Amino acid sequence: MNFEKIQYIERKTGEIKTEKVMGEGALKFLYYNPFGKLALHAVVKRKFLSDWYGRKMSKPESKEKIKSFVEEMEIDMSEYKRPIEDYASFNDFFYRELKDGARKIDYNENVIVSPADGKILAYQNIKEVDKFFVKGSKFTLEEFFNDKELAKKYEDGTFVIVRLAPADYHRFHFPVDGEISEIKKILGYYYSVSTHAIKTNFRIFCENKREYAILKTEKFGDIAMFDIGATMVGGIVQTYKTNSSVKKGEEKGYFLFGGSTCILVFEKNKVVIDKDIIENTQNKIETRIYMGEKFGNEKN
């Protein structure tokens, strides 16, 4: 398989852009080189490496990396509450908070919004996933949930992936009002969730560390909200109160250092995904989306 640049659609303009990727050379080695694949399975996917790097990025000296990272990744710091010099470590910077009003949230009760900043793929029917990325192995909801009954509940449902790159805002939020459950944690590995990694094996989502909660809603049914760990993600922190009422746009939690993914799973016939996102997904290209931005409607 050839190594390709990661391209995506800038939704506001329709322009095709190339993503700036941190550690692109390493990703190429790990997922496209036979020796790299050996290293990936022997070391890189393991918890100890992500834990070690997470601790390293929490040390005071790590803050020296912030300025160059911001410049290289062209991050607009005017959107955030604190300036570069205020962060105690790179990790402190990594889960930085937005200023109030930095993201426009669509509060129309009939629409659902993105839980995070990132690149989105959406499958109106979960069965469509196998057509796009999986080769030689099948993605199953039973493995993903690690629960046969829940897999049955969401059979033929809708599957939405929001991939967060390292340069993105790394807090995630509720996509609609509802009642949120406690967190269920599923142990797993720490593979990268970059587009390069997913193209080689979509089942990474069934193998990585992940946790989920069920958001019970009035108009969109019971939404399974997954937060997925990845290479170098030191942890997933949930900041919400379990078994409570939540509002669209309220913070749910954040990822520590690394890139990672939020996945929403809907029951069958509960949501209609926006046409542009479906078309881009069918063309195997992600769409840029921001927290609070609409990606679908209630199915009437």
Curated annotation (Swiss-Prot):
Keyword Membrane included in the entry's annotation: yes
Entry protein name: Phosphatidylserine decarboxylase proenzyme
Catalytic-site annotation from UniProt: D117 (charge relay system), H173 (charge relay system), S260 (charge relay system), S260 (schiff-base intermediate with substrate)
Described function: Catalyzes the formation of phosphatidylethanolamine (PtdEtn) from phosphatidylserine (PtdSer).
Post-translational note: Is synthesized initially as an inactive proenzyme. Formation of the active enzyme involves a self-maturation process in which the active site pyruvoyl group is generated from an internal serine residue via an autocatalytic post-translational modification. Two non-identical subunits are generated from the proenzyme in this reaction, and the pyruvate is formed at the N-terminus of the alpha chain, which is derived from the carboxyl end of the proenzyme.
Site (Cleavage (non-hydrolytic)): G259, S260
Cofactor: pyruvate
Swiss-Prot/TrEMBL keywords: Cell membrane, Decarboxylase, Lipid biosynthesis, Lipid metabolism, Lyase, Membrane, Phospholipid biosynthesis, Phospholipid metabolism, Pyruvate, Zymogen
Organismal lineage: Bacteria, Fusobacteriati, Fusobacteriota, Fusobacteriia, Fusobacteriales
GO BP field: phosphatidylethanolamine biosynthetic process
Protein source organism: Fusobacterium nucleatum subsp. nucleatum (strain ATCC 25586 / DSM 15643 / BCRC 10681 / CIP 101130 / JCM 8532 / KCTC 2640 / LMG 13131 / VPI 4355)
Subunit structure as annotated in this protein's UniProt entry: Heterodimer of a large membrane-associated beta subunit and a small pyruvoyl-containing alpha subunit.
Major location category of this protein: membrane
Family: Belongs to the phosphatidylserine decarboxylase family. PSD-B subfamily. Prokaryotic type II sub-subfamily.
The EC number(s) this enzyme carries: 4.1.1.65
UniProt xrefs under InterPro entries: PS_Dcarbxylase, PSD-B, PSD_type2_pro
EC class name: lyase
